[in-house]
Amino acid sequence: MQEIILSQEHKAWKHYLLAVKSKDNKNSDNLPDITVIKKEVTIDKAHLATYQSVCKFQKSDELSATYLHILAHTLFMELLTQKEFPFALLGMVHLKNTISYYQRVTSKDKLEIQVSFGEMGVHPKGKVVPIITRIYSKGKLVYEEVAENLKRVSSGESGEKVKARIEDDVLMGGS
């Protein structure tokens, strides 16, 4: 597994430039084993207050699940713009997020954020790219998220044929 440790001063702007680079290995069935890590993350209280105001959240020291999601965004971009990632970032479609918030987190906590890929899945319209975020406080997992994104891939088959093939694979236990 490759680990990429980000500094506190890491800036995201370069990722938006890298996102427009064209690369597309549509035949890839594997995602790279890379984890992007940011340690000793401290909360900027002015940023938190602005976020809470914009979202019409009550002012609080407690970090919402959505704020924790935002904290991980730079790491998402770092992961998705690695040269080993087989797909172009532009054109990917967000499908869903599944968030588990295990323990209250406040602006006083120092956090470690880790973002990595899960196992690539299939979808009637392409491939599902899961991005897993884990946030730790004092070494304990406090937040976990799986963001599923679709990489559209034309297989030459109609959507119904692909769906039927996937359902057959599931019923037969995979092949």
Predicted regions and their residues:
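Residue-level marker of positions within ordered structural domains that often coincide
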Residues: 56, 104, 152
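Hydrophobic beta-sheet segments that form the core/acyl-binding groove
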Residues: 96-138
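Generic structural hydrophobic/aromatic packing signal, biased to beta-strands
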Residues: 16, 51, 99, 133, ...
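An exposed, glycine/acidic-rich loop-and-rim segment of catalytic or binding clefts
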Residues: 128-175
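Hot-dog-fold acyl-thioester-processing enzymes
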Residues: 1-96, 156-175
